Amino acid sequence: MPQAPETLDGWYSLHLLYAIDWSSLRLVPTEERQTIVDELQTFLNKHEEARTNHVGDHAFYNITGQKADILLWALRPEMKDLNAFENEFNKLKIADFLIPTYSYVSIIELGNYLAGKSDEDPYENPHIKPRLFPELPQSEYICFYPMDKRRNETYNWYMLPLEKRQELMYAHGKIGRQYAGKIKQFITGSVGFDDFEWGVTLFADDPLQFKKIVYEMRFDETTARYGDFGSFYVGHIVTKDNLQDLFAL
């Protein structure tokens, strides 16, 4: 049986996507609607403490297109912490005007294909630890999509020898490293947690970089032969300064 590579796992991850029920929200008096948005802002402010105390983080983005209107991504030390985060959000007044469109449960993951043998605790490595327990960038744009490694009669990633998978992942990683400084990437593993095997979350100040990296990787053997993808969600950051504009009517 082919050898399964070890993974390094960090914070648990929850992507929540919603459509806004504008028709219902439009019926709410202006003063009451302002109270609803203020409560949402208080919620977001409160959870910035997780970032400050380094026990998690979150990102909030306005999604482009009709698949969703907002994306809320939360990272926490334990899965039950994600439940608490989601439950608290669902009890906000704004939740009465949100329609869930998609969610994704996973965990920050670093593949160990290329790791050498070492007695060092990787969780204490100053280069690895911030990638497992990250402070999320406040980039202008986000791109999220789930994916699988293909497994069928012709191409089955999981039946490849470890050495071949290592070779392919090395070449795959070289492409990603060319976008250092342009894109910040987070891989979350979801085998046993959700319908796909991984989630990919990209941050950039220029959304064109999302197209460039995904297109270039289409020609990489790892993706061309073994990659299957779900829906792509792209959006612009929601900050304290533009939250009011998002819900303005």
From Swiss-Prot:
Pathway: Porphyrin-containing compound metabolism; protoheme biosynthesis. Its cofactor is Fe-coproporphyrin III. GO terms for molecular function: heme binding; metal ion binding; oxidoreductase activity, acting on the CH-CH group of donors, oxygen as acceptor; peroxidase activity. GO terms for biological process: heme B biosynthetic process. The active site is at 145. Keywords: Heme, Heme biosynthesis, Iron, Metal-binding, Oxidoreductase. Its EC number is 1.3.98.5. Fe-coproporphyrin III binds at residues 131, 145-149, 172, 185. Pfam families: Chlor_dismutase. Fe-coproporphyrin III acts both as a substrate and a redox cofactor. It comes from the Bacteria. InterPro entries: CHDC (IPR031332), ChdC/CLD (IPR010644), Dimeric_a/b-barrel (IPR011008). It catalyses: Fe-coproporphyrin III + 2 H2O2 + 2 H(+) = heme b + 2 CO2 + 4 H2O; Fe-coproporphyrin III + H2O2 + H(+) = harderoheme III + CO2 + 2 H2O; harderoheme III + H2O2 + H(+) = heme b + CO2 + 2 H2O. Belongs to the ChdC family. Type 1 subfamily. Involved in coproporphyrin-dependent heme b biosynthesis. Catalyzes the decarboxylation of Fe-coproporphyrin III (coproheme) to heme b (protoheme IX), the last step of the pathway. The reaction occurs in a stepwise manner with a three-propionate intermediate. This is Coproheme decarboxylase. The lineage of its organism: Bacteria, Bacillati, Bacillota, Bacilli, Bacillales.
